[in-house]
Swiss-Prot record:
Organism of provenance: Xylella fastidiosa (strain Temecula1 / ATCC 700964)
Gene: ruvA
Any GO BP annotation: DNA recombination
Protein's UniProt name: Holliday junction branch migration complex subunit RuvA
Domain comment, as recorded: Has three domains with a flexible linker between the domains II and III and assumes an 'L' shape. Domain III is highly mobile and contacts RuvB.
Family per similarity comment: Belongs to the RuvA family.
Keywords, sorted A to Z: Cytoplasm, DNA damage, DNA recombination, DNA repair, DNA-binding
HAMAP family documented for this protein: DNA_HJ_migration_RuvA
């Protein structure tokens, strides 16, 4: 239907935005990972899209990368996961990190994501394990220990008052090769203070 939009960003209020394409304003809902990377209003954007039609409503979702959209679509096929949880997952972790968690079989790390409980995490592991390479472009992700460290750091940042999605993003962006949670937290907080 609508696979991609390129136009001028005219409105931006999390998690919604409006993109003007030749005089038509398309309203899209985007994950916070996409929202945080968008330019200011008035600049051109290029987004991959996913259109859904339900009984009484239609919705358009936007993503910066093809791999984000691909993961969103794979998540929609998992029993019990709707658009809200799929967006929460994409807002909390990168595609590569998520693929690494699936490949490592780490249900506990998945439960850190808002809206994902133990049963949902286990269901995702079962239903997505064979497809993990599909949504991260075949990139091999290593470091289960590093992913555990990032998850622990995200939990610690939540305890400091950061919202779950923001804490997950901060920990992911600060993730290092170190297995020391304190180092990841320190790096995340230093980035915020700059």
């Amino acid at each position: 239907m609508i696979g991609r939009l390129r136009g001028v960003l005219t409105s931006k209020t999390p998690p919604w935005l409006v993109v003007d394409v030749c005089g038509v304003g398309y309203e899209l809902e985007v994950p916070m990972s996409t929202f945080c990377e968008l330019p200011d209003v008035g600049y051109e954007v290029n987004l991959f899209t996913h259109y859904t039609q339900k009984d009484d409503s239609a919705a358009l979702y936007g993503f910066l990368s093809e791999s984000e959209r691909r993961l969103f679509r794979h998540l929609q096929r998992v029993s019990g996961i709707g658009t809200k949880i799929a967006l929460a997952i994409l807002s909390s972790v990168s595609v590569d990190t998520f693929a690494g968690l699936i490949q490592a079989g780490d249900a506990n790390a998945l439960t850190v994501i808002p809206g994902v409980g133990k049963k949902t995490a286990e269901r995702m592991l079962v239903e997505l394990r064979d497809r993990a390479a599909d949504f991260n472009n075949g990139i091999s992700t290593s470091g289960k220990l590093n992913l555990d460290t990032v998850s622990e750091a995200a939990l610690a940042l939540q305890q400091l008052g950061y919202k779950p999605a923001e804490a997950a993003r901060m920990a992911r962006d600060a993730g290092t090769e170190s297995d020391d949670v304190a180092i990841v937290i320190k790096k995340a907080l230093q980035t915020v203070l700059r």
